[in-house]
From Swiss-Prot:
Gene Ontology MF term list: 3'-5' exonuclease activity; DNA-directed DNA polymerase activity
Lineage: Bacteria, Thermotogati, Thermotogota, Thermotogae, Thermotogales
EC number: 2.7.7.7
Protein name as annotated: DNA polymerase III subunit alpha
UniProt function note: DNA polymerase III is a complex, multichain enzyme responsible for most of the replicative synthesis in bacteria. This DNA polymerase also exhibits 3' to 5' exonuclease activity. The alpha chain is the DNA polymerase.
Keyword Endoplasmic reticulum: no
Length: 842
């Protein structure tokens, strides 16, 4: 009996894990087994693990009821060509009928139920078999041999004068650039990475020729002058004091990583164009069921199984592949065709192997990532930016960063106000600090108030006020203490991975170097380095992405209306983002109206200071329906819309009405709904009457509180402020959401969980009593505290003397403690949320 293993990558119920399989074979005294799937997804994993255990991996292909088996590498490559459709026949290779072999989908009896469960979720029968007790060794029968699956991957070859061309580019920049460039080129050449970097250069060059926007750079590659002069990156590494050794050094064995960001909607176009010049392959990836979804699936497929059985199935199945997919970024580019198993999608081959398999067999992928923000920027058709624009930095420093790359979150907005960046260096620092680790450790507070930072660090790293924020600073400190650039990068990585055996000799060398330089506090310096190194960020990446952040902020600061038009176009299906955009438009002084059936289209419409929401914010309204409506406009009634736009569902018309799209045609929304209800199809009424069904007209009574509830139902957010509330006394609802701040707001209840300040309206998570109240409102839509309101109510902030103040409502007061005395500022509030408060009178 010859076993034939089917892997989970056939997606037909197998739960075989290769490590367990290898141990089973050794226990049984076998030295080989056949793996034959309908694809080659598992081939590299199987090959690697079997050979690691000293076993012979016998590869096969399961096709048309037969098992084709490769005895050696030559036959394996023949199988791959047959699988790829490059040949239609395969000769001189062992072939078995399915019935001649024992298909193995599990390894021991405890896994059988898990295998049956997997068969069920793939819609297959319950016929599964395990590993037979007695079996023959297939390697002996077939005289099969062990072999690896490595391939000869060659990147395109650069022209012979490639180095000289780069040196010519550096000559006008001065001796510092020429010297560094030559050093970088020498390391790249010795490591054999010149073709790799040249290939990435060609990718970027082709993208730019196609008019595709490419990002300024990503990751440690931004620290390379070679990458900058090739046009791969757009950030001068010498200007920003970036280290090449962070990208590549003599000790590094694997190729460096150069990832390329391009506008997301053109990524496929670029890959197709690249395939005209090179051999291009996309990369497979595999989706797994999440813990929650797997448990739900087990409960629904096996409702009667015991808890013990369910837990056993869960343990057996968790982590197994559920479906194949295509890697979002990875692309293999080669000078020569590669003997890889592939499937084809949109004329581009996709290798069956995932990124880890490719790495194992010597194939290096390049990540080409589609970035939506680059498409957004491209739509402005602006290529040159002034990176010293005060208006842009002011916008960021206020935390007015909806739609600004990497700064939309509440923590990011708070950090914007704390750091208040005034230049690109400080903006880069802001991005580096905007991560959970640095924020938890208080690095942002230390940076903004750097009094307690040792003088040595303040002098050495003035740009970060002496605070260790970047990985490159750790390397600079190590190099200052006598380590080479290569040693400094090894130390950085060893600290990050907590590899003590690598760290300790380098730290000892650092200590000695610091003492030789007269640093008596060498121990303290090393202690600070170790404490902060785990929070340090890649400066090269931070500087590059700061350019994208700045560009989006600049466009918002100088082209507000166009910015919001595009923001709505890119986010029309995200009600939460549209709600925030509405708040910010109101904060900018615009009157925001519901979608209008005769004015609105698929984009935001500006008429002076009046703004009309797109029809596409209404649920169920897509671009096709909008185009139909635009063709028949003007529309004079609900009835006309139904008569002239064929097939528009009644519930969509109702959503348009409750969203306010017919407000200019009817005195109120109740009347529009009444007309809709009168238009119930006559033939449906007649059919129902024929069968004696009682037909009732739907009620169209709308109370004042229902308006916002119905808007929320039809658009995902409430819009219309239906009550008047005194204004100008405190902050506004739109202040809270525009700046992402916790602020005092005067509100009136609209319905159970909806409030208005007379200018805006929002849902809150707290039930507010009837009447007007002062509330402390959070941008998370929580009311932190409620106070009854009268005309004498004042909200008093208490801050220390370092706080920056801004204009506020007339009933807001800030008390600043200066030299032991309290100074009061009426009509002002602190710019940051670090304040104590009280309300008077209560």
């Amino acid at each position: 009996m010859i076993p034939w293993v089917i892997s989970p990558y056939s997606f037909d119920g197998s739960v075989v894990r290769f490590e367990k399989l290898a141990l089973l074979l050794k226990r049984k005294g076998l030295k080989s087994v056949i793996l034959a799937d309908r694809n080659f997804h598992a081939a590299v994993k199987f090959n690697t693990i079997m050979r690691k255990h000293g076993l012979i991996p016998v590869h096969g292909l399961w096709k048309d009821g037969r098992i084709f088996v490769a005895r050696n590498r030559e036959e394996f490559d023949s199988l791959v060509r047959y699988y790829n459709g490059e040949t239609h026949e395969i000769e001189d290779i062992p072939v078995f009928q399915e019935s001649e072999l024992t298909p193995v989908r599990y390894l021991d009896a405890s896994e059988k139920k898990a295998s049956i469960f997997m068969r069920k979720i793939f819609g297959l029968d319950e016929d599964v078999q395990g590993f037979p007790e007695k079996c023959e060794d297939v390697a002996d029968i077939l005289n099969a041999e062990a072999y690896d699956l490595r391939v000869n991957h060659r990147f395109p070859t650069p022209p012979k004068n490639w180095n000289e061309l780069l040196i010519k580019k550096a000559e006008p920049l001065g001796e510092e650039y020429i010297s560094r460039l030559k050093r970088e080129l020498e390391v790249i050449k010795r490591k054999g990475f010149t073709p790799y970097i040249y290939t990435v250069e060609k990718v970027v060059e082709i993208a730019k020729k196609m008019g595709i926007k490419v990002g300024p750079g990503r990751g440690s590659a931004v620290g390379s002058l070679v990458a900058y002069l090739c046009g791969i990156t757009e950030v001068d590494p010498i200007k920003y004091d970036l280290l090449f050794e962070r990208f590549l050094n003599e000790e590094r064995q694997e190729p460096p990583d150069i990832d390329v960001d391009v506008e997301d909607r053109r990524r496929k176009d670029l890959i197709k164009e690249l395939s005209k010049s090179f051999q291009v392959y996309q990369v497979s990836t595999f989706g797994n069921l999440t813990e929650k979804s797997l448990k739900n699936l087990i409960n629904s497929v096996l409702p009667d199984a015991s808890l013990e059985e369910k837990n056993e199935i869960y343990k057996t199945v968790y982590g197994l592949p559920h479906h194949p997919s295509v890697h979002a970024a990875g692309v293999v580019i080669s000078e020569n065709p590669l003997p890889l198993p592939t499937r084809t999608e949109e004329d581009i081959p996709i290798t069956d192997y995932d990124m880890y398999d490719l790495q194992e067999i010597g194939v290096v992928k390049i990540d080409i990532l589609g970035l939506k923000t680059l498409s957004f920027i491209k739509d402005f058709k602006k290529e040159i930016f002034d990176y010293s624009d005060e208006k842009t930095y002011h916008l960021i420093s206020k935390g007015k960063t909806l739609g600004v790359f990497q700064l939309e979150g509440l923590q990011a907005r708070k950090l914007c106000r704390r750091i208040s960046p005034r230049n690109m260096d400080e903006l880069s620092i802001l991005l580096a600090l905007n991560r959970p680790g640095p924020l938890r450790s208080g690095l942002d507070v230390m940076f903004s108030n750097s009094k307690n930072v040792p003088a040595f660090f303040r002098k050495m790293f003035p740009e970060t006020r002496g605070v260790l924020i970047y990985q490159e600073q750790i390397m600079r400190l190590a190099m200052f203490a006598g380590l080479s650039g290569t040693e400094a990068d090894i130390l950085r990585r060893a600290i990050a991975k907590k590899e003590r055996e690598k760290m300790e000799p380098l730290l000892e060398k650092m200590k000695k170097g610091l003492l030789e330089k007269g640093m008596e506090n060498a121990e303290q310096i090393l202690e600070i380095l170790l404490n902060f190194s785990s929070y340090a960020f890649n400066k090269s990446h931070s500087v590059a992405y700061a350019h994208i952040t700045y560009q989006t902020a600049y466009l918002k600061a100088h082209h507000l209306e166009e910015f919001f038009k595009l923001y709505f176009a890119y986010n029309s299906s995200d009600a939460g983002k549209i709600f925030l955009a509405v708040q910010e438009l109101r904060n900018e002084g615009y009157r925001v109206h519901p979608p209008d059936i005769n004015i609105s289209g698929k984009d935001l419409v500006f008429h002076g200071k009046d703004v009309y929401l797109p029809l596409t914010v209404v649920k169920g309204v897509g671009v096709t329906l909008v185009e139909q409506i635009e063709k028949i406009r003007p529309v004079s009634s609900v009835r006309e819309l139904q008569e002239r736009v064929t097939g528009v569902p009644r519930n969509v018309v109702e959503s348009l009405i409750t969203a306010g799209a017919f407000d200019k045609l009817y005195e109120n929304r109740k009347l529009a709904l009444e007309e809709l209800n009168k238009r119930v199809e006559k033939d449906i009424l007649e059919i129902r009457s024929l069968f004696g069904e009682k037909v009732e007209q739907e009620s169209s009574n709308i109370k004042i509180g229902d308006i916002t509830e119905l808007e929320e139902k039809s658009m995902g957010f409430p819009l219309t402020p239906v009550h008047e509330v005194p204004t100008g006394l405190f902050a506004r609802i739109d202040d809270v959401f525009t700046y992402g701040r916790i602020l005092p707001v005067l509100v009136k209840r609209v319905s159970r969980n909806i409030v208005t300040d007379g200018l805006s309206v929002c849902r809150v998570r707290t039930d507010v009593p009837d009447g007007v109240h002062l509330v402390l409102l959070s941008p998370l839509q929580k009311i932190i505290k409620i106070w009854p309101f009268n005309e004498n109510t004042r909200f008093v902030y208490r801050v220390d003397f370092t706080a920056t103040l801004e204009k506020a409502g007339q009933n807001e007061i800030t008390e600043v403690l200066k030299n032991g005395a309290v100074v009061r500022y009426e009509g002002y509030r602190p710019l940051t949320d670090e304040y104590r408060y009280r309300v008077v009178p209560r």
